[in-house]
Amino acid sequence: HLPFYRQHQRLTDSGINVSRPWLTQLGQQGAGLLEPIYDAQFASIRASRVKAIDETPIKAGRASPGKMKTAYFWPVYGELDEVCFPFFESRRHEHVEAALGLTHTEGAVLLSDGYSAYAQYAEKAKITHAQCWAHTRRGFYEAQAVEPKAAAQALELIGELYEVEAHIRAQQLSGARKL
């Protein structure tokens, strides 16, 4: 990825003179041609029984001179290894519903971090919410100061799961063979 202003500068440096607005329009038209593919891929993700979501901040748009606004990509991953990156200007809870909708396959599971928007969405959509092990492990790690014995036991069990995952990766297992 290279911002349009840098692409424009490289073209100009190479003796190719085009306007920056034309370059922007060309990019927008190209993205428009890809929209049906994006929509089909997103529909496949929404139909997945298991899907994962996370939000990640980016700087986009000017908040004031010299300062950029924070916006968010919300990568969504489906069980057929599809990924889409919906964009929203904030981290508000309703963006989860806007991205995933409320119609789900029976037994659907949403895998995410501990952000409360995901748990609220799962409850509203009547699906199972599962946290990723890295975030779950962090809670037990922090609990060692309060409940050292129980936290250590939980961390040991999570470590065993990590060992199973390492074995799966080392053996390059896929699909049902992972089970």
Residue map of PLM features:
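Catalytic center-proximal scaffold of phosphoryl-transfer enzymes
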Residues: 1-179
